[in-house]
Amino acid sequence: MASKQYEEALQKANLSDMAERYDDMAKEMRLAVTLAHEDKHILNVMARNLFSVAYKNLVSSRRSSWRMLCSERQKLEGKDPSVVHVINEKIKVVEEELLRFCDEVLDIITTYILSLEEAQKNIEYNIFFLKMKGDYYRYKAEVVTGPEHSEVSKHAAESYKEATEKAKTLPPTNPIKLGLALNYSVFHYEILNDSEKACSIAKGAFDEAIKELDTLSEEHYRDSTLIMQLLRDNLTLWTSREEGNVMGDEGKGDPDEN
């Protein structure tokens, strides 16, 4: 019965994705993850991607809203206190929603997804979700301040570092490994303000992958080359900033979060 419910939950989540009903999609994937955990089996590639897409869309829209509102507040600060007050109220609502979704993802990954013995044995699966943990702690770090910022940044760093250690066994062109390097470098640049380390991670991943591009399988070619392009774009942007030539745009994370 659980298996039938699981398949039905995935079907519903897939339809919700097509209909862009991401709240429904997240709810359906929470059920699918719970059922998979009860049966002690890990999510297949389709299921883990559905889980990722559901929360990516819920969180990405809030991140965009938060940035837009903060930008608007900056323009009006010192000019119109009453409007700034309204903007602050709206920012608070968006932050609460964003943090709630992040905490939801982190709890699901820790409690259900990575707690299974099989999950620890599957290296790519393990790295995929450790990276995801790092990403969602990073999203929290974008909006929280003070001691909480330090705490979530520390958790993000630990998740990315653990994933990076495990990813050493994967080929340099593996898209999960490349996506991890991309997001870990963005974390160093945007959260830790360490441009040197960010560039080092991005350049190292790009250079290693370029050396083995000829061995890249057709299955992974599109994903891997896309992430390599994003690594190169970030390197160009970051080095230009260091030279004082460019201002503005943020570094690009992997395609799952754009």
Curated annotation (Swiss-Prot):
Disulfide bonds: none annotated. It comes from the Eukaryota. SMART domains: 14_3_3 (SM00101). InterPro entries: 14-3-3, 14-3-3_dom_sf, 14-3-3_domain. SUPFAM superfamilies: 14-3-3 protein. Belongs to the 14-3-3 family. This is 14-3-3 protein homolog. It comes from Encephalitozoon cuniculi (strain GB-M1) (Microsporidian parasite). The lineage of its organism: Eukaryota, Fungi, Fungi incertae sedis, Microsporidia, Unikaryonidae.
